[in-house]
Amino acid sequence: MFKLGIVVNPFAGLGGPMAMKGSDGLDLSRVHADDLGRSAARALRCLERIAESGIEELTVYGFAGLMSAQSAANDVLRIAGLPFISVGQPADPNLTTQVDTREAAQAIVKAGVDLLLFVGGDGTARDIFTAVGTRIPCLGVPAGVKMHSGVYAVSPESAADIVVALITGKLVEVTQQEV
């Protein structure tokens, strides 16, 4: 059984349209409800492609709610058809912070996942690295404004292809990249 961890920064990608350099320090009064689906949509593209690969021995672990792209209007894991186990939840289900990202990553590592997949920008990558260091392989799904780190796949679909290759034994090398 392959254990895949997931952390979604629900605010990733919002900084660009708001003329910011990322979502850190985001003024939520300026965020429109329509904008909150950006990172969830990228997570869905990745997870659906993983599900379409036909891999059955896979369980996804993460924080409940927005950090796993779950909301009343949009439950990405259910839509993709992947089994999910919650390892916690953010302090405020409607507003996640860097602290929540770090706590989610640490809880996911404690669950014994094989790979941590995260959806966000360079700020999210730094938070993930701060939380887990090099203890487990991590792969980013690009969703942010600043995408300079080598830890990201070039698209949600290519991230899915990497995950599938890792699960099926076709990917045998994992390397460190600068965050």
Residues covered by each model-derived region:
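Gly/Ser/Thr-rich loops at beta-strand to alpha-helix junctions
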Residues: 10-13, 64-68, 118-126, 145-147
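ATP/NTP phosphate-donor binding region
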Residues: 1-114, 160-179
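Short glycine-/acidic-enriched loop or helix-start segments at secondary-structure transitions
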Residues: 16-17, 72, 127-129, 150
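Hydrophobic, well-ordered secondary-structure segments
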Residues: 101, 122-125, 138, 156, ...
